Amino acid sequence: MESTEPTAPTGPAEFTAEEAVPVLRVEDAAAVVAWYGRLGFVRQWEHRFEPGFPAFVEVARGGVRLFLSEHTGDARPGTLVHLRVRDVDPVASEFGVRVEDAPWAREVELRDPDGNRLRIGTPTE
């Protein structure tokens, strides 16, 4: 008789891809895509199972990708994502916020239209 007990891992799993893409819960994907456009993100694709169903959208800026989901079970509102940028000052200027100087970075914190938090910073030397 074969055992159905799970086996203990023998080591790290092998992966060929090494990328984490955060999923952010949104109510109105089109409005949020426009908001992320102010940060230089561009809509890559959108999926709906059928017309009128919730949207699942990818936005990207360079090598950074985010998934925006109208599906209630995919993520919780208020998620925090930290983005590193070369220069945080243009972001602060675009959104009319003040840059905070911390020992590890110069940062701003923004909230998208659904309350997801983006901490955007330039690391200090």
Residue ranges and their predicted role:
Residues 11-13, 48, 99:
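Residues embedded in well-ordered secondary-structure elements
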Residues 37-44, 97:
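Conserved acetyl-CoA-binding loop of GNAT-fold acetyltransferases
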